[in-house]
Amino acid sequence: MRINPTTSGPGVSTLEKKNLGRIAQIIGPVLDVAFPPGKMPNIYNALVVKGRDTVGQQINVTCEVQQLLGNNRVRAVAMSATDGLMRGMEVIDTGAPLSVPVGGATLGRIFNVLGEPVDNLGPVDTRTTSPIHRSAPAFIQLDTKLSIFETGIKVVDLLAPYRRGGKIGLFGGAGVGKTVLIMELINNIAKAHGGVSVFGGVGERTREGNDLYMEMKESGVINEKNISESKVALVYGQMNEPPGARMRVGLTALTMAEYFRDVNEQDVLLFIDNIFRFVQAGSEVSALLGRMPSAVGYQPTLSTEMGTLQERITSTKEGSITSIQAVYVPADDLTDPAPATTFAHLDATTVLSRGLAAKGIYPAVDPLDSTSTMLQPRIVGEEHYETAQRVKQTLQRYKELQDIIAILGLDELSEEDRLTVARARKIERFLSQPFFVAEVFTGSPGKYVGLAETIRGFQLILSGELDGLPEQAFYLVGNIDEATAKAMNLEMESKLKK
């Protein structure tokens, strides 16, 4: 059953009339609370502890019920630090799961797991809230038609296209352009699809969250002058927070995204950075609750928890949530249960390559390692599929020849191989593209390239029509017409120098 968004969550005045319990035991972030007989809260209900510690400091801790222990006691996990809590303190049962603000007022703001703004810009101007625990859309509500989600980024749309309402895994180390790629996608969905984005920072560094916020303000993704014109809402539960907060922050971000999809009927991009930290937090909570660990120490409910989150990310007849999830692979072991469980849900993977970034080719998406289940003739059409396969074959052949070139040089290659290398180098450069959000740093205007234009450009390179053009003409341009214009300019410049 779908729960409709409720208006205005429980305020303090209404809280006082709810069930009251008392803390019976505290072990780190886990609280045992005793309630009067017949007044037990439900699983996932939010409990609030209000009071003062021994120094007189105000305490306000929200917890979530995880287990009913019997003898009128429940076990709950705290969403913030439990410092200063004492046995016997009063606990209020709110009578409902955690509810967070949703709607247009969330754009341009930063929230914590409880939906409280943490950016010092005052309260959120909305009375509409929604519970973070909801069932996935019923099968009858789903939009089962397979369609491509056009990003305007050539390398993605041609070689590893995203599915509308699909899940994409983003792999890449530090400093290869993950943040810039994420910001460009946020920018493009707003411009081309009239959509919005929600960014869920799950268990990552606070510094990275702050850097992302600053870069978004600098590039215009967050509009400081008119905050309502921003294109993204940010939800952070960083690695210094208790496991309960890190486990639920993904659901908070997803709930905000669902409102844009179901009520505003928009296309939404949901970023989760990092999905591994969601699993890790679940593992910590599972151990704290005394559950028997499963393989490699993970929680026994790993697949269920992952499925509950992922099944809510989908296309309905109203709109779509397309999710891009950064995946950390512990010790580069792809068989580790956390990444292995994630892979089962992914429709496409975008792999960022340090080698391409070192060459200055941005976006540094690896054209041979990135994959997509959408790249099939019956979905994308014969023309797109054939072009993509020929591009991959050319790049693969170039990769195979690189050792020979390094040892013997280009002159030792056959005529056919030399032609392949020349075209592959043009393709490699043509896969680069100037980004709108990088205009501030590069000075060159960003380009959105439609899928039809992308296919036409690569077909012209593969056909040999552009063999006479210098390869630098293909570097950091939009469509193929810009490359030919750039080649003419380069020719003019070289003539003037002579």
UniProtKB/Swiss-Prot annotation:
Gene Ontology annotations for the cellular component aspect, listed alphabetically: chloroplast thylakoid membrane; mitochondrion; proton-transporting ATP synthase complex
Record-linked InterPro entries: AAA+_ATPase (IPR003593), ATP-synt_VA_C (IPR055190), ATP_synth_F1_bsu (IPR005722), ATPase_a/bsu_AS (IPR020003), ATPase_alpha/beta_chains (IPR050053), ATPase_F1/V1/A1_a/bsu_N (IPR004100), ATPase_F1/V1/A1_a/bsu_N_sf (IPR036121), ATPase_F1/V1/A1_a/bsu_nucl-bd (IPR000194)
Compartmental location: Plastid, Chloroplast thylakoid membrane
Molecular function terms from GO: ATP binding; ATP hydrolysis activity; proton-transporting ATP synthase activity, rotational mechanism
Keyword Metal-binding appears in the UniProt entry: no
UniProt membrane topology term: Peripheral membrane protein
Binding residue positions for ATP: 172-179
Job of this protein: Produces ATP from ADP in the presence of a proton gradient across the membrane. The catalytic sites are hosted primarily by the beta subunits.
The protein's name: ATP synthase subunit beta, chloroplastic
Gene field: atpB
